[in-house]
Swiss-Prot record:
Gene3D superfamilies: 3.30.230.10, Histidine kinase-like ATPase, C-terminal domain, MutL, C-terminal domain, dimerisation subdomain, MutL, C-terminal domain, regulatory subdomain. This is DNA mismatch repair protein MutL. PROSITE patterns: DNA_MISMATCH_REPAIR_1 (PS00058). InterPro entries: DNA_mismatch_repair_CS (IPR014762), DNA_mismatch_repair_MutL (IPR020667), DNA_mismatch_S5_2-like (IPR013507), HATPase_C_sf (IPR036890), MutL/Mlh/PMS (IPR002099), MutL/Mlh/Pms-like (IPR038973), MutL_C (IPR014790), MutL_C_dimsub (IPR042120). GO terms for biological process: mismatch repair. SUPFAM superfamilies: ATPase domain of HSP90 chaperone/DNA topoisomerase II/histidine kinase, DNA mismatch repair protein MutL, Ribosomal protein S5 domain 2-like. CDD domains: HATPase_MutL-MLH-PMS-like (cd16926), MutL_Trans_MutL (cd03482). The gene is mutL. It comes from Xylella fastidiosa (strain 9a5c).
Length: 619
């Protein structure tokens, strides 16, 4: 078959395969055009989940009558005029491909009017044939009607899913849009019935979060807002125990554009690494703002992928911001009070809410902490830097279990919550009143009951102390008597050569000895017995894919977590009331104390109102 120029209609239909995948794609492109036109209200009307009709009405600037035919021409746009405009584009659309692609696979009607015009105009197109532009009564703004989507491409129409499924995709996209544009009023109707309505409002208000993402998300949200290096990251992440089995509540926006980015997703997941249960995923709504010239949005016709000029900086910025917010969480602290400031910046950390002054009447701080410190002294000590092989012996003394202490079966109630104490005087986790089956601590707080898994809580406290101790020591290296030869792919050898300084900071002294071979002369001392070959390969893989790695830190943390687990107080160990109270105070002062090292929750709160409902009180 000879080479020939394809007809315009076929070109547009081929392009539609990338831009118009389903009705939700059409809704996305048309509503983004409305937002770029300055609309503050958008109405979406659907029939048969968009398969029969998609009608988008907006109150934007509108178009002049003579511009309607231009709007549906390929690569015709009002948003860019030069390469400089493209490199700094801030609008949601700019390619001039969406409308021609939609026109080529539907029966299309375009109506518009500017506020300055006496009347509007309408243009109808079917099968790629443009009708005439004729005057038409219309309010200021634009209306687009897309009927019989894929009517002329039967193969594409057969791939559409059930009506409920297609509507679900549109509703999910509307949710994402409402999160990104809280000043936009959005109405979604299906088959003549109002399905969703998002009113303009403050994005950070509880009502807005509850309306879009539900009460559970809103009540577990930790606010994020950090700026630095010309970047700003703000939004919400949720506490680790509100994890998900999938990634359905992960929303990322770059300069207001909903995108998917593996590097940012990887950074967030790493920040949650030691507080998230295995196989679970964090939920978040994050907005990344930066100079448009530092991000390339012209990667894919659907504009759902971006490419950062400095991906390593972005990864590190997101990781540190999210990790810093999680580190501020303390057991008993209300979620929305956390991270409301400039997380990670100077003076950003809010005052710790659990800083409470104890008096002798409330249990005697010196006596309580002294008793608890004596019984758990091993975890108060700095951990030595040892190899994995030497760890059990070195830490045997450090974690030697103190002799079992037995207390009265019924604890004395006056050691619990003082009756005269006001709500403002009670620490977040309250005061211990009893121990349940040698496993759980029961504590009375200002508004109900706190239940603490004492082993899980003590495990996290010990883990954080060990991490701080080793952070103070720094990462020590262990030279090898005989250099180790490691055979790798040539690409990995290139990475090792380019990232020699990074590897040295991680404890690896590596030189290239051939196209696909490396000489390893030193390794991290703490991880000498932890399969350094596999660890180094993983580090090189991360550096190649993400430009960043935490493999060494994660391997170290895994070892420290194991040590902390072995050193934590065991089930059936009887604690005195004073020891339990001291453990509660330590939880309030320890980062990430809401989860153990494996991501399990360490405590739960039952409000008095909730307990009253169990017994039908007040009815």
């Amino acid at each position: 078959m000879p080479i020939r120029q394809l007809p315009e209609i076929l070109i547009n239909q081929i392009a539609a395969g990338e831009v118009v995948q389903r009705p939700a794609s059409v809704v996305k492109e048309l509503v983004e055009n409305a937002i770029d036109a300055g609309a503050t209200r958008v109405d979406i009307e659907l029939e048969a989940a968009g398969g029969r009709l998609i009608r988008i009405r907006d109150n934007g600037h509108g178009m002049a009558a003579q511009e309607l035919p231009l709007a549906v021409l390929r690569h015709a746009t009002s948003k860019i005029a030069s390469l400089d405009d493209l490199e700094a584009v801030a609008t949601l659309g700019f390619r001039g491909e969406a409308l021609p692609s939609i026109v080529s696979v539907s029966r299309f009607t375009l109506m518009s009017r500017r506020a300055m015009d006496e009347h509007g105009a309408v243009l109808q197109i079917e099968g790629g044939t443009l009708g005439e532009v004729i005057p038409h009564a219309h309010a200021p703004g634009t209306t687009v009607e897309v009927r019989d989507l894929f009517y002329n491409v039967p193969a594409r129409r057969k791939f559409l899913r059930a009506e409920r499924t297609e509507l679900g995709h549109i509703e999910e996209w509307a949710r994402s849009l409402a999160l990104a544009h809280p000043d936009l009023e959005l109405r979604l109707s299906h088959n003549g019935k109002l399905s969703r309505r998002y009113k303009p409002g403050d994005w950070y208000s509880d009502a807005r979060l509850i309306e879009i993402l539900g009460e559970d998300f809103a009540h577990q949200a930790l606010r994020v807002d950090h700026s630095g290096a010309g970047l700003r990251l703000h939004g919400c992440i949720v506490q680790p125990h509100y994890s998900r089995s999938n990634t359905d509540q992960q929303y990322l926006y770059v300069n207001g554009r909903a995108v998917r980015d593996r590097s940012v997703a990887h950074a967030v997941k790493q920040a949650y690494s030691d507080v998230l249960y295995q196989g679970r995923h964090p939920a978040y709504v994050l907005f990344l703002e930066l100079d448009p010239a530092r991000v390339d949005v012209n990667v894919h016709p659907a504009k759902q992928e971006v490419r950062f000029r400095d991906a390593r900086l972005i990864h590190d910025f997101v990781y540190r911001t999210v990790q810093g917010t999680l580190a501020q969480t303390r057991a008993g602290t209300p979620p929305l009070a956390v991270g409301a400031g400039d997380v990670g910046g100077e003076g950003a950390r809010p005052p710790v809410r659990h800083a409470v002054s104890f008096s002798g009447r409330r249990g005697g701080a010196s006596h309580v902490l002294g008793s608890y410190s004596a019984s758990t002294a091993p975890l108060m000590q700095s951990a030595p830097s040892v190899s994995v092989a030497d760890a059990p012996a070195a830490y045997a003394a450090l974690y030697a279990a103190p002799p079992t202490q037995v207390i009265d079966a019924v604890p004395q109630m006056q050691t619990g919550l003082p009756l005269a104490a006001g709500a403002g005087d009670v620490p977040p986790l309250g005061y211990a009143i009893a121990q349940l089956h040698g496993i759980y601590i029961l504590a009375e707080c200002a508004d109900g009951l706190i239940v603490v898994d004492m082993h899980a809580a003590h495990e996290r406290i010990g883990y954080e102390r060990l991490k701080r101790a080793h952070d103070g020591i720094g990462l020590r290296t262990q030279p090898l008597l005989v250099p180790m030869t490691l055979m790798v792919a040539e690409r990995e050898a290139d990475v090792a050569e380019c990232e020699a300084e990074t590897l040295a900071s991680l404890g690896f002294e590596v030189t290239r000895s051939g196209p696909g071979s490396l000489q390893v002369r030193s390794i991290p001392a703490l991880l000498a017995q932890a399969e350094p070959e596999i660890l180094l390969r993983d580090v090189l893989s991360d550096l190649s894919e993400h430009g960043h790695t935490r493999r060494v830190a994660e391997a170290r943390d895994t070892l420290l977590a194991t040590m902390a687990c072995h050193g934590a107080v065991r089930a059936q160990r009887r604690l005195s009331i004073s020891e339990m109270n001291a453990l509660l105070r330590d939880m309030e002062a320890t980062e990430r104390s809401g989860q153990c090292n494996h991501g399990r929750p360490t405590w739960a709160r039952f409000s008095l109102a909730e307990i009253d409902r169990w017994f039908l009180r007040g009815r």
